[in-house]
């Protein structure tokens, strides 16, 4: 059993090293944002949930990225329940859907991803000591196929993928006021990237 456990541990370690190296190379100027989660405060009476929680590696992914890129941690409270448009607390619906009484229905994972991104930008502004941060966009050739706007696609990370990144940079600075104004500031399609908690997928969201 010990032999198989060590083999599994080494495979996980190798995968995380390749994943973090790939992310840091594909996005060399990026700031990676993670929720500041404490695994030990998340255990409950559900043994299956606790078993799956033990196998998650998000903290290890974040720590590995710290050696290769800039990593920030944000408050995880209500990231999946705060409306990305008006900021009010939303009601949970069945499955991966949340509802705002004012703004309508959203995908829960998209909402979480957007709010983590928003809090990360606000934190970066404080750390940089300015009223805004430079905005930079990236276009990736032949890395991901085009998907309809607003749709979610799960992609298994490939450690052998290489991509050219023609980056269009803007020196404009901005103040984050509300998500509607924020999205319109960008002169390129806003894409938010997040790593699944189990480290198995790279989630890509196209903000409409």
From Swiss-Prot:
<keyword id="KW-0238">DNA-binding</keyword>
<dbReference type="GO" id="GO:0032196">
    <property type="term" value="P:transposition"/>
</dbReference>
<protein>
    <recommendedName>
        <fullName>TnpB-like protein MJ0012</fullName>
    </recommendedName>
</protein>
<keyword id="KW-0862">Zinc</keyword>
<keyword id="KW-0233">DNA recombination</keyword>
<dbReference type="GO" id="GO:0006310">
    <property type="term" value="P:DNA recombination"/>
</dbReference>
<feature type="binding site">
    <location>
        <position position="86"/>
    </location>
    <ligand>
        <name>Zn(2+)</name>
    </ligand>
</feature>
<dbReference type="GO" id="GO:0046872">
    <property type="term" value="F:metal ion binding"/>
</dbReference>
<feature type="binding site">
    <location>
        <position position="83"/>
    </location>
    <ligand>
        <name>Zn(2+)</name>
    </ligand>
</feature>
<dbReference type="GO" id="GO:0003677">
    <property type="term" value="F:DNA binding"/>
</dbReference>
<keyword id="KW-0479">Metal-binding</keyword>
<feature type="binding site">
    <location>
        <position position="103"/>
    </location>
    <ligand>
        <name>Zn(2+)</name>
    </ligand>
</feature>
<keyword id="KW-0815">Transposition</keyword>
<dbReference type="InterPro" id="IPR010095">
    <property type="entry name" value="Cas12f1-like_TNB"/>
</dbReference>
<dbReference type="Pfam" id="PF07282">
    <property type="entry name" value="Cas12f1-like_TNB"/>
</dbReference>
<keyword id="KW-0814">Transposable element</keyword>
<comment type="similarity">
    <text>Belongs to the transposase 35 family.</text>
</comment>
<feature type="binding site">
    <location>
        <position position="100"/>
    </location>
    <ligand>
        <name>Zn(2+)</name>
    </ligand>
</feature>
